[in-house]
Amino acid sequence: MESLPTTVSGKSDRRGRFSKSQNTSKPSLILAFFSCLAWLYVAGRLWQDAQYRAALNTVLKMNYDQRPKVLTVEDKLVVLGCKDLERRIVETEMELAQAKSQGYLKKQKSVSSSGKKMLAVIGVYTGFGSHLKRNKFRGSWMPRDDALKKLEERGVVIRFVIGRSANRGDSLDRKIDEENRATKDFLILENHEEAQEELPKKVKFFYSAAVQNWDAEFYVKVDDNVDLDLEGMIALLESRRSQDGAYIGCMKSGDVITEEGSQWYEPEWWKFGDDKSYFRHATGSLVILSKNLAQYVNINSGLLKTYAFDDTTIGSWMIGVQATYIDDNRLCCSSTRQEKVCSMA
C-alpha cells in the first residue's frame, strides 16, 4: 500500500509531461502551417513571375520581328524610289543626247513654200486691251493678208503673241479668237495665263511654241511698244544666218532694285550678290535667239528659273550655256542714233 502514492505520483508526472509537450507542439504546428503558406505564396509568385517572363519574351519576340530592319544605302535608295528615278534620268539623258544629235527637233517644223528653212519667227507681244495697237502695227510696218503670206514665203513669220484669260473661254478669249479668224496673225499660247505678273513666264511659252511650230534660224521677241524697220531687221538677221549660239540685242546691266514697291523691284534681289548688280543681258524690248538657244529653252522650259522681268530672266538662262553675246546698237530702240532697226512706238 505504500507503493501506491509512488504510482499515482508517476502518472501525474507523465500527464504533466504530456500536457507540456502538447503545449509546446502547438506553436510548432502554427509555425509549420505559416511556413507552408509562405512556401505556397513564394511558389505562386515564382510561377507567376515565370508566366510574366514568358509573356514578356513573347512580346519582345513579336516586337523584334516587327521592328524596322537596318537598311543599307542601296535598300534606302530602293525604298525612296531613287533607283527607279536614277534609271529614268539615265534614259532621259540618252533621249536628250539623241534629240541634240537631231537638232533638238521633236517633229518636222513648217518651212517656207520654197522648201528653204525659215529665216526668223518674230513674236510681237500683245494683250487683251491692245486691239488699237495691233491695228496700228498692221497699218504700218507689219504686213497683213496676202502681204503676210508673201513675207512667209521669204522665210519670215510674224505673229502677235498672247496667252489665255484667267477665266478660260470668257469674252476676252472669244474676242481674240474672232480677231485671229479674221487676220490669222496670232500665236495663242494655250497654256499661259495672260497677266502682267506672268510676263517672265510668257517668254518660255513663246519660244517653246515658236520652236514647235516653225523651223527657223532665229526667234525674235518684240514688245508691243516697238516699231520695226522690217527690211532692216531681215538684213541684220541674214548677216547672222547659220550662227549658232547667238544671243543678240541691245546689251545692258544695272542695279538691282531692292526697295519693295518700286517699279523695277526684284523680289529675289539677294541672289545677285553683295553689289546688287544685274549681269549683262539684252533689253526686253527686242531679244533675238538663234535656233539652238531657242530649242534649249523649249526643251528645258520646265526647269528654267524666272525672275521679276523677262529680260533678266532670259539673260539668266544664257549664262549657263555656250551663248555668243552680240551687242548690236541697231537694236537699241530708245536710242537717238539713225542706223537702227527699231524705235519706240
UniProtKB/Swiss-Prot annotation:
Cofactors that this protein relies on: Mn(2+)
Cellular component, GO annotation: Golgi membrane
Knockout consequences: Reduced levels of arabinogalactan proteins.
TM ranges: 28-44
Protein name: Hydroxyproline O-galactosyltransferase HPGT2
Organism ancestry: Eukaryota, Viridiplantae, Streptophyta, Embryophyta, Tracheophyta
GO molecular function: hydroxyproline O-galactosyltransferase activity
Residues recorded with modification N-acetylmethionine: M1
Bilayer disposition of the protein: Single-pass type II membrane protein
Highest taxon, organism lineage: Eukaryota
Ranges in the topological domain labelled Lumenal: 45-345
Residues in compartment: Cytoplasmic: 1-27
Similarity annotation: Belongs to the glycosyltransferase 31 family.
Region (Disordered) location: 1-22
Any GO BP: arabinogalactan protein metabolic process
Main location: Golgi
Tissue: Expressed in roots, rosette leaves, cauline leaves, stems, flowers and siliques.
Subcellular location(s) per record: Golgi apparatus membrane
Residue spans of biased composition, Polar residues class: 1-10
A family per Pfam: DUF4094
